[in-house]
């Protein structure tokens, strides 16, 4: 089952990367040479950002199989409450002097 989950996770990552690539088509259209050059420059800049983002998506590790909540619950179950000592029957000397 983990192989299937790994494969589904990889397919999901690849679909996301493909979607990112499809959202940035190569610039087409009329205009002066400087307008076309600027459109291509902006496109290359977006393309580099998409490649960096795709690399981060692809290399980002999957969450651990053991959810942190389960580990936290196990840790909490191991905790015990210690018996507290009985409170003193007489107030300390400093409090008695302050009251007088």
From Swiss-Prot:
GO terms for molecular function: DNA-binding transcription factor activity; RNA binding. Residues 16-24 are annotated as: Homomultimerization. Keywords: AIDS, Host cytoplasm, Host nucleus, mRNA transport, RNA-binding, Transport. Residues 22-41, 81-100 are annotated as: Disordered. It is found in: Host nucleus, Host nucleolus; Host cytoplasm. GO terms for biological process: mRNA transport. A motif (Nuclear export signal and binding to XPO1) lies at residues 71-82. The keyword Transport applies. Its main location: host cell. Pfam families: REV. Residues 22-34 have a biased composition (Polar residues). The keyword Transport applies. A motif (Nuclear localization signal and RNA-binding (RRE)) lies at residues 35-49. GO terms for cellular component: host cell cytoplasm; host cell nucleolus. Escorts unspliced or incompletely spliced viral pre-mRNAs (late transcripts) out of the nucleus of infected cells. These pre-mRNAs carry a recognition sequence called Rev responsive element (RRE) located in the env gene, that is not present in fully spliced viral mRNAs (early transcripts). This function is essential since most viral proteins are translated from unspliced or partially spliced pre-mRNAs which cannot exit the nucleus by the pathway used by fully processed cellular mRNAs. The RNA-binding motif binds to the RRE, a stem-and-loop structure present in incompletely spliced viral pre-mRNAs. This region also contains the NLS which mediates nuclear localization. These overlapping functions prevent Rev bound to RRE from undesirable return to the nucleus. When Rev binds the RRE, the NLS becomes masked while the NES remains accessible. Homomultimer; when bound to the RRE. Multimeric assembly is essential for activity. This is Protein Rev. It comes from Human immunodeficiency virus type 2 subtype A (isolate CAM2). The gene is rev.
